[in-house]
């Protein structure tokens, strides 16, 4: 069955929750509120907000927990995953969640200083804002 990938940009509704499975694997989750902008005549208005539960695993869970918090604007790329279960009362429930491959802060209205997972800050290789020293384009 083909997988469905999505790219989302929205705001965290709460701080990410990071925990461990019984096997010791890090797992985290957060809710992302995504509100499209809709043009009505000469003005732009907020459209209907959609809420997505985003799951992150292993090191990504730790990095998200250390880097993002409630209200932060974030970008998420991941797979849609449908999950179904039955409650103790016998009711069938289902949910569609996003299993994230990539998560990062939005730089539209904020700045960030990337720091490698080993604790070393990303080296400044340029001579000023927007520099592309080294020929990478």
Language model features by range: what are they?
Residues 8-12, 32, 70-82, 100:
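OB-fold and OB-like beta-barrel modules that bind single-stranded nucleic acids
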Residues 13, 17-19, 57, 81, ...:
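Conserved positions in beta-strands of structured domains
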Residues 15, 35-39, 59, 83-85, ...:
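Short coil/turn motifs at secondary-structure junctions
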Residues 48-59:
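Beta-strand/loop nucleic-acid-binding surfaces
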Residues 6, 10-12, 26-28, 50, ...:
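Hydrophobic core residues within well-ordered beta-strands of beta-rich domains
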Residues 57-93, 106:
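Beta-rich strand-turn-strand
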Residues 20-33, 94-97:
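Short aromatic-glycine-enriched beta-strand elements
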Residues 1-4, 16-24, 39-45, 66, ...:
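Acidic, gly/ser/pro-rich intrinsically disordered tails
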């Amino acid at each position: 069955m083909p997988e469905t990938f999505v790219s989302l940009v929205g705001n965290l509704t709460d701080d990410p929750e990071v925990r461990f499975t019984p096997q010791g694997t890090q797992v985290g989750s957060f809710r992302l509120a995504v509100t499209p902008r809709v043009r009505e005549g000469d003005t732009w208005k907020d459209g209907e907000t959609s809420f997505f539960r985003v799951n992150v695993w292993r090191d990504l869970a730790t990095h998200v927990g250390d880097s993002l918090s409630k209200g932060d604007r974030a970008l998420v790329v991941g797979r849609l995953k449908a999950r179904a279960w039955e409650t103790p009362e016998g009711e069938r429930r289902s949910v569609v969640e996003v299993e994230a491959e990539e998560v990062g802060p939005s730089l539209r209205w904020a700045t960030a200083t990337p720091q490698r997972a080993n604790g070393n800050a990303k080296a400044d290789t340029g001579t000023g804002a927007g520099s592309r020293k080294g020929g990478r384009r």
